[in-house]
């Protein structure tokens, strides 16, 4: 029990920038490794399967991102409510909130698996996926969504740990399973010649292992954030609080992802080479947003704990500090990605047409950045 307590972090006192950075850095590294799941899939199929397979994986990115961002929205809701009770020192409600979060998570796993599997081909047709990559894209998504339970359990479980200030253990699990994903990708593709199905199976196996490790921490601990499978129940009052925070965040993420699906439908019109090039650069570009997402998660926990402790002024100061820190980090990373786009794209493929398409996308991205700075 003593060991478990050392993993929590009280953010209601101490240097605000230092606390935010200490909390955000493990999150940032963890987000990088979580994003590597799909990125590594693209690198492996691009180098060892072919351009059409790379285009198939790339064309599914917007759909898989939509599911990830939607789950993250609900995770934010749970983190805010649990963090508020942690900051207030209300251990009874905190424990109840954890039980409600996990009970709702198991129900969501069933609902979302059924929804995404049934809507799989519809989403690909909606994006006007070309016939020569449709079959492989559909296969990849079916396998991915059959194992989406692992993703949801990990995200919600790590959200509970983040609420009490523990970002290290979710990071450890994610690093280990990301390395495992790379190894399984190579084994399934090079040794067993499973093609695009191999990288999909590798991804869901790794996600289930990270989910199992996170669930084991929550079930086996004796600390205030523990839960027992036999004691799970839904507290409708707490669930309403979680949904009031999490649902708007989830909907906002889905709207953004859905707009990207419209863009993808136009890109698909130009064929596999353009699809692969744009898809590869978009995977690289996503890393620009990781510091913002990580700092937002850190700020969410910081604000929740301080509001719970009735330190509203400190909560406001934390919000301002997180914005300033995010802008500085994003500026540096964006510059590096734009300058070295060609080198980064060559990690995915040696196809010059794909690389040229990706470089064109990076130049347009530079213009977008300049416009935003001027505005």
Regions found by a protein language model. Give the residues of each.
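Small-residue-rich hydrophobic transmembrane alpha-helices
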Residues: 54-114, 151-170, 278-341, 367, ...
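Residue-level recognition of transmembrane alpha-helices
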Residues: 24, 58-61, 105, 141-144, ...
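Signature of the first transmembrane helix
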Residues: 18-79, 83, 247-267
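Helix-terminus/linker motif at the lipid-water interface of multi-pass membrane proteins
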Residues: 32, 36-55, 124-131, 187-194, ...
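Short membrane-interface helical motifs at transmembrane helix boundaries
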Residues: 111-138, 142, 332-359
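Alpha-helical transmembrane segments of multi-pass membrane proteins
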Residues: 131-154, 286, 292, 352-367, ...
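Interhelical loop/hinge segments that connect adjacent transmembrane helices in multipass membrane
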Residues: 1-22, 203, 212-256
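Membrane-interface helix-loop junctions in multi-pass transport and translocation proteins
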Residues: 178-212, 341, 356
């Amino acid at each position: 029990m003593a060991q478990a307590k050392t993993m929590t972090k009280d953010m209601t006192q101490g240097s605000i920038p230092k606390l935010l950075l200490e909390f955000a850095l493990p999150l940032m590294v963890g987000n990088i490794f979580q994003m590597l799941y799909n990125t590594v899939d693209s690198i492996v199929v691009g180098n060892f399967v072919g351009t059409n397979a790379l285009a198939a994986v790339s064309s599914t990115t917007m759909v898989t991102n939509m599911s990830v961002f939607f789950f993250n929205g609900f995770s934010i809701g749970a983190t805010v409510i649990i963090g508020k009770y942690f900051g207030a020192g209300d251990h009874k409600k905190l424990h109840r909130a954890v039980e409600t979060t996990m009970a709702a998570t198991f129900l969501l796993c069933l609902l979302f698996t059924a929804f995404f599997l049934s809507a799989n081909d519809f989403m690909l047709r909606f994006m006007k996926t070309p016939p020569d990559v449709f079959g492989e894209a559909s296969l990849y998504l079916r396998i991915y969504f059959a194992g989406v339970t692992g993703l949801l359990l990990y995200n919600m479980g790590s959200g509970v740990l983040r609420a009490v200030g523990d970002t290290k253990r979710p990071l450890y699990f994610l690093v280990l399973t990301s390395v495992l994903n790379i190894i399984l990708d190579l084994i399934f593709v090079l040794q067993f010649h499973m093609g695009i199905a191999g990288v999909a199976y590798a991804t869901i196996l790794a996600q289930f292992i990270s989910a199992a490790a996170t669930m084991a921490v929550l079930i086996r601990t004796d600390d205030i954030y523990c839960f027992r499978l036999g004691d799970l129940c839904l507290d409708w009052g707490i669930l309403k609080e979680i949904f009031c925070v999490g649902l708007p965040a989830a909907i906002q993420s889905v709207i953004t992802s859905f707009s990207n699906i419209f863009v993808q439908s136009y890109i698909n019109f130009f064929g596999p080479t353009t699809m692969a090039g744009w898809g590869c650069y978009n995977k690289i570009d996503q890393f620009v947003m990781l510091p913002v997402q990580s700092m937002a998660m850190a700020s969410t926990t910081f604000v929740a704990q301080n509001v719970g402790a009735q330190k509203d002024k400190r909560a406001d100061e934390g919000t301002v500090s997180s914005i300033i820190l995010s802008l500085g980090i994003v500026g540096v990373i964006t510059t590096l990605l734009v300058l070295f786009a060609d080198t980064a794209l060559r990690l995915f493929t040696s196809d010059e047409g794909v690389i040229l398409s990706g470089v064109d996308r990076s130049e347009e991205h530079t213009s977008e950045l300049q416009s935003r700075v001027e505005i």
